[in-house]
Swiss-Prot record, chain A:
It comes from Lactococcus lactis subsp. lactis (strain IL1403) (Streptococcus lactis). Its main location: membrane. Part of the ABC transporter complex OppABCDF involved in the uptake of oligopeptides. Probably responsible for the translocation of the substrate across the membrane. Essential for uptake of peptides larger than three amino acids and for growth in milk. The chain crosses the membrane at residues 9-29, 99-119, 137-157, 183-203, 248-268, 289-309. Gene3D superfamilies: MetI-like. The complex is composed of two ATP-binding proteins (OppD and OppF), two transmembrane proteins (OppB and OppC) and a solute-binding protein (OppA). One of its GO terms (biological process) is peptide transport. It is a multi-pass membrane protein. Disulfide bonds: none annotated. Pfam families: BPD_transp_1 (PF00528), BPD_transp_1_N (PF19300). GO terms for cellular component: plasma membrane. This is Oligopeptide transport system permease protein OppB. Belongs to the binding-protein-dependent transport system permease family. OppBC subfamily. The keyword Membrane applies.
From Swiss-Prot, chain B:
Disulfide bonds: none annotated. The lineage of its organism: Bacteria, Bacillati, Bacillota, Bacilli, Lactobacillales. The complex is composed of two ATP-binding proteins (OppD and OppF), two transmembrane proteins (OppB and OppC) and a solute-binding protein (OppA). InterPro entries: BP-dependent_transpt_permease, MetI-like, MetI-like_sf. Keywords: Cell membrane, Membrane, Peptide transport, Plasmid, Protein transport, Transmembrane, Transmembrane helix, Transport. One of its GO terms (cellular component) is plasma membrane. The chain crosses the membrane at residues 27-47, 94-114, 127-147, 151-171, 202-224, 260-280. The gene is oppC. Its main location: membrane. It is a multi-pass membrane protein. Gene3D superfamilies: MetI-like. Belongs to the binding-protein-dependent transport system permease family. OppBC subfamily. Part of the ABC transporter complex OppABCDF involved in the uptake of oligopeptides. Probably responsible for the translocation of the substrate across the membrane. PANTHER family: D,D-DIPEPTIDE TRANSPORT SYSTEM PERMEASE PROTEIN DDPC-RELATED, OLIGOPEPTIDE TRANSPORT SYSTEM PERMEASE PROTEIN APPC. This is Oligopeptide transport system permease protein OppC.
Length: 319, 294
């Protein structure tokens, strides 16, 4: 077990290295540098020039790269040009918002997708199956932002059932009202994300159940006279969950990924919205940091997924 | 050889026709989609650029059913129906171009890596794994903002950087199952060249799958392009897209008080994409049947 994990972590090192080089050159392509964030109406351009020289922005690229990498590892990714704050501080604040909203949406997604796949797989070829297959092919194909817009138009602006922006209402005081106000602000984006996010789980879980139903061990269990309910719950469902587990690492790290469209449309101040406002404000140090963060989360997600798979599926450990 | 090929292509058309006859929804979708494409492309052929670029403030935000403007006008005083046509044409063009690049690159790379396998395939797969992990949406948006002299062709290029991977992996997986079949082994023993086996023997067997994949890729690209344009990082100004029309909805006041500026474009996207999905589902069933009966 530990051998698998250590080997997998070692495999991540070259990937991280490539990612850092990519993001570094990406940052170099963008105009501006960490000192652009310090320039205000009262700064002397010569002073900034001196700072740039002192920071080694005119050094050969590999020296700059190594220094940048060192800083990035220490969590120093420069100053935000627009917010005049360290990038990591801003990201930290926004990450909390994104985390809670994503958590709610992930929970809702599983609540929708799992019963859906079980119903579809148990009634293979019947109308229930057709219904959920069609539903998922539609949500997969329709651009989600169109749906988000209609949702906020109907439930946010026309019916006024839900707030159309922010994370908490200004007149909520005390822990419990603030908590409920936060949940209330999250419901619309999280629900929309969940309604449109079932297709991945549904496809894997449904075909997983269908595959497992025809396995020999299921036939053996039936022949032994095990009750159909028990076969389904104990044997089929457990094995069919493996493909879902294989994606779970990405789900965990995805909690901090930020949903660009949903957060922009629902006015939810998370990392996705931060990215769009940073792009519009040409806040390049922030953009670089967000891309680095998301790339890193992706690699970490792959790592976690592999470790989870090794934990739940003994066959992988043996290989 | 030629006779066999002819029969094969005939039965492909035949089985698609049969499936469409059974699936009324897909049949209606096909007719509808063809009609939409014809109307959009023929109508926009008769439009001059000044028609949809010039601004007429006097006619700004006219409500629907005003004289001469069945669906009203937008913030530049331009007729919504005309804007829908030209925007739909631009959005379809981008989606067509990206789909074409995706399919050509994806099919060639997929068949080659699936056929040869081995070390190159392994490295290539690691590479695609890595690219898939990258935050593609963010990188596309950054490219759009930092590329100098940005135009429609740059947008097509940028979107294509990430779009080919899914198709490549699908075609590779299917090619790998084909390689072990008897007809490929027989061709190899009789000394047919690798190139001929890959593209004259294996690839035609994947053609139904490719068509089904093409419809889904096309629908996805419409979503991606209009989404980018909606956020303001898609087609450049002067080239209206369905997304730029929907962008009117980002202003809460316009969204609630002047829904005619953005709702028609959303409806067009919804209906077109739905039609494509229904056709794609029917085609996928044909692909699965042909895979099973062979």
């Amino acid at each position: 077990m530990w051998k698998v994990i250590i080997r997998r972590i070692l495999l991540m090192i070259p990937q991280l290295f490539i990612l850092s080089i990519l993001v570094f050159f990406f940052a170099k392509l963008m105009p501006g540098d960490p000192f652009s964030g310090l320039i205000g109406p009262h700064t002397d351009p010569h002073e900034v020039e001196a700072l740039r020289r002192a920071a080694g922005l005119y050094d050969p690229w590999w020296e700059q790269y190594l220094r940048w990498l060192g800083n990035a590892i220490h969590g120093n990714l420069g100053m935000s040009y627009n917010l005049k704050e360290p990038v990591m501080t801003v990201i930290g604040h926004r990450a909390i918002n994104t985390f809670w909203m994503s958590l709610l949406s992930v929970i809702l997604t599983y609540l929708f997708a799992i019963p859906m796949s079980i119903v579809a797989a148990r009634n293979e070829g019947k109308w229930q199956d057709q219904l959920w297959l069609t539903y998922n092919s539609i949500t997969f194909g329709i651009p989600p932002y169109v749906f988000y817009l209609l949702i906020i138009f109907i439930f946010g602006y026309s019916l006024n059932w839900f707030p159309t922006g922010g994370t908490v209402s200004p007149d909520a005081m005390g822990i419990i009202p603030v908590f409920f106000s936060k949940i209330y602000h999250m419901i619309l984006p999280a629900f929309s994300l969940a309604v449109f996010g079932t297709v991945g789980i549904f496809t894997y879980f449904r075909s997983g159940i269908l595959d497992e139903q025809t396995q020999d061990y299921v036939r053996t269990a039936r022949a032994k006279g095990v009750k159909e309910k028990v076969i389904f719950r104990r044997h089929i469902l457990r094995n069919a969950s493996l493909p879902i587990a294989s994606n779970f690492g990405f789900v965990i790290t995805g909690l901090l990924g930020g949903a660009i469209f949903a957060e922009t449309i629902f006015g939810y101040p998370g990392l996705g919205q931060l990215f769009i406002t940073s792009i519009s404000g040409r806040d390049y140090s922030m953009i670089t940091a967000l891309i680095l963060l998301n790339g890193f989360l992706g690699l970490l997600g792959a790592l976690l997924s592999d470790i989870i798979m090794a934990m739940v599926d003994p066959r992988i450990r043996i290989q | 050889m030629t006779e066999k090929k002819h029969k094969n292509s005939l039965s492909l058309v035949h089985s698609i026709k049969e499936e469409l006859k059974k699936d009324k929804l897909a049949m209606i979708s096909t007719i509808f989609l063809v009609a939409v494409f014809l109307i959009v492309y023929i109508y926009s052929m008769f439009l001059k650029q000044s028609n949809y670029v010039d601004v007429n403030i006097m006619d700004q935000y006219l409500a629907p059913l005003t004289t001469g403007h069945l669906l009203g006008t937008d913030n530049g005083g331009r007729d919504i129906i005309m804007m829908l046509m030209i925007s739909a044409r631009n959005s379809f063009n981008i989606a067509f171009a990206v789909t074409l690049i995706t399919l050509v690159v994806g099919n060639i790379l997929g068949v080659i890596t699936g056929y040869f396998g081995g070390r190159f395939d392994l490295i290539f797969m690691r590479f695609t794994d890595f690219v898939m992990i990258l935050p593609s949406m963010m990188i596309i948006i950054v490219f759009v903002t930092i590329i100098p002299r940005f135009n429609s062709w740059s947008l097509i290029g940028i979107i294509s950087i990430f779009s080919w991977i899914g198709t490549t992996r699908l075609i590779r997986a299917r090619t790998m199952t084909e390689v072990n079949r008897d007809y490929v082994q027989a061709s190899k023993t009789s000394g047919t060249s690798d190139f001929k086996i890959m593209f004259r023997e294996i690839w035609p067997n994947l053609s139904t799958l490719v068509i089904a994949e093409a419809t889904l890729v096309f629908a996805g690209n419409i979503g991606l392009e209009t989404g980018l344009s909606f956020l303001g990082f898609g087609l450049p100004a002067g080239t209206p897209s369905l997304g730029t029309m929907i962008n009117e909805a980002t202003n809460p006041e316009t969204m609630t008080d002047k829904p005619w500026t953005w709702v028609p474009a959303t409806v067009v996207i919804l209906i077109v994409v739905l039609a494509i999905i229904f056709i794609g589902n029917a085609l996928r069933r044909v692909a699965d049947q042909r895979q099973a009966t062979r």
